[in-house]
Amino acid sequence: MPTCARRRTSSGTTARPKQVPLTHANLCASADNIRKTLQLTPEDRCMNVMPLFHIHGLGAALLASLAAGASVVCTGGFDGLRFHSLLAKVQPTWYTAVPTMHQVIVDRAPRDIDAARTNPGLRLIRSCSAALAPRLMSDVEKLFGVPMVEAYGMTEASHQMAANP
């Protein structure tokens, strides 16, 4: 029987929250799926603003990057006031966040417009963990001039199950 690598608590959107055991194979398969979806390579650098106790931060930002041999810069959490300056400093090729974070990023952009436009290496942005409004997706893509990948997942599936290019 496979050993449990991590136990996660589901969000409980369809029933009461429950403990979900994830095996090493679950986590590796999910990381590889995300790596393939995003076409990550060793040249990529992820700026991780998601907490590592959340499957989004652990699976998508950290493990998918490591599966590609890419680098990850963990910011210590999301800070809307510092996001654009961190983006300019870290110079990632991608980042992943939840829609509420993307909204803060868009809302702060007029105040941080110089920093928002100083990352020529940014090649994609990922959103997951909640529904993304089409308008917000468009606003983020216009702000950064790169495509946004909208992913869908669930804790029980080790995170990402599908993604829109």
Positions of the model-derived regions?
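Conserved AMP-binding A3 loop
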Residues: 5-29, 164
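Conserved pre-ATP/AMP-binding loop-to-beta segment of ANL
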Residues: 1-9, 16, 39-45
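Conserved AMP-binding
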Residues: 40, 50-54, 130
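Gly/Ser/Thr-rich phosphate-binding loop
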Residues: 92-97, 106-165
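Alpha-helix capping/helix-boundary segments
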Residues: 79, 100-102, 132
